[in-house]
A protein has these predicted regions:
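Acidic, turn-prone loop/beta-hairpin segments
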Residues: 1-25, 53-145, 149-152, 158-167
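Short helix-adjacent coil turns
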Residues: 28-35
Length: 169
């Protein structure tokens, strides 16, 4: 699907990928391999595994093959899988070859003959990233307040609590 037909959360996932890929490419240019590894590891565990893949599963498993919601997630997952495979190839050469052989978009016989992703800076959308960062911070803030209220015995249980949300800017 084209970018303008992707869901908001899918555009956020793509924007975060663009941000991470840009940082990784700069680190490679500077031979800062520790930054490459740290950035990719954090992105894979926090952004992808703990968030995006988790919330995309329902759309991928239950929506019809032609639905925009499913195709939106598939488009983003494919773009990220292609780009990440290229980005990890220098540090995980054998590991990167396996997904590369299974990507329908693989444009070379080996990931090691393929170019790094280009144009990733254009995927970055600071306003979208900022908005989703605020949204994703809410559960932690709410849980922190709930814990504080329960230890102060202001409320006995979560259903009895009310948490005021900050106004939308």
């Amino acid at each position: 699907l084209p970018l303008d037909r992707l869901s908001d959360v899918d555009r956020y996932a793509l924007a975060r990928y663009g941000e991470v890929a840009s940082r990784v490419l700069r680190a490679y240019d500077r031979y800062e391999f520790q930054t490459v590894v740290h950035t990719l590891n954090n992105y894979l565990t926090v952004d992808l595994s703990a968030f995006y893949v988790d919330i995309s599963k329902d759309r991928l498993y239950t929506f019809g093959p032609g639905s925009d919601a499913r195709r939106s997630a598939q488009t983003v997952i494919h773009t990220i899988a292609d780009g990440l495979t290229r980005l990890v190839a220098p540090i995980l050469p054998f590991t990167a070859d396996e997904p590369w052989r299974n990507l329908p978009s693989a444009d070379a016989d080996s990931v090691h003959l393929a170019d790094f992703p280009t144009g990733v800076d254009t995927l970055v959308d600071p306003e979208l990233i900022d908005r989703w960062t605020r949204v994703l911070s809410l559960p932690g803030a709410v849980n922190g307040e709930m814990h504080k209220l329960s230890t102060e015995q202001v409320t006995g249980s979560a259903p009895a609590a009310a948490v005021p949300l900050p106004p939308h800017p």
